[in-house]
Amino acid sequence: MSRANVLSLYRRVLRIARSWKAQSSIPKDTDTEKKYITQEARTLFRQNQQITDPESIQRCMEECEARIEIGLHYRNPYPRPTYLPPMGLATQKGRKLRAQQRLRKQAKPVYLQSQDET
């Protein structure tokens, strides 16, 4: 992906933030959500600024596009909750722990790949 494509995507997010209207139509909620969209975009684009691998850049752009589409569809700028797979939170050690960590990583949707683990 080229720098122009990434910058175009960033500008698209900022345009969406400028024209965003909260689902509740309350001006305070609209302002809060606009600020969230702008801040989240700024944070994630800066966090991924040093990535040079074309595949990683492509994955980040796909994540951004997925979050845009989900946000516009549901009229909610915040990430959707995800649920852990069965046996994804048990307190095991060794091989079972690694299997659980692998399950959690596989269950993470594309639109949340940049989010920190909690």
UniProtKB/Swiss-Prot annotation:
InterPro entries xrefs: Complex1_LYR_dom (IPR008011), Complex1_LYR_LYRM1 (IPR045294), LYRM1 (IPR040330)
Listed Basic residues bias regions: 93-107
Stretches for region Disordered: 91-118
UniProt cross-references to CDD domains, sorted A to Z: Complex1_LYR_LYRM1
Domain of life from the UniProt record: Eukaryota
PANTHER family xrefs: LYR MOTIF-CONTAINING PROTEIN 1 (PTHR14273:SF0)
UniProt record similarity statement: Belongs to the complex I LYR family.
Name by which UniProt lists this protein: LYR motif containing protein 1
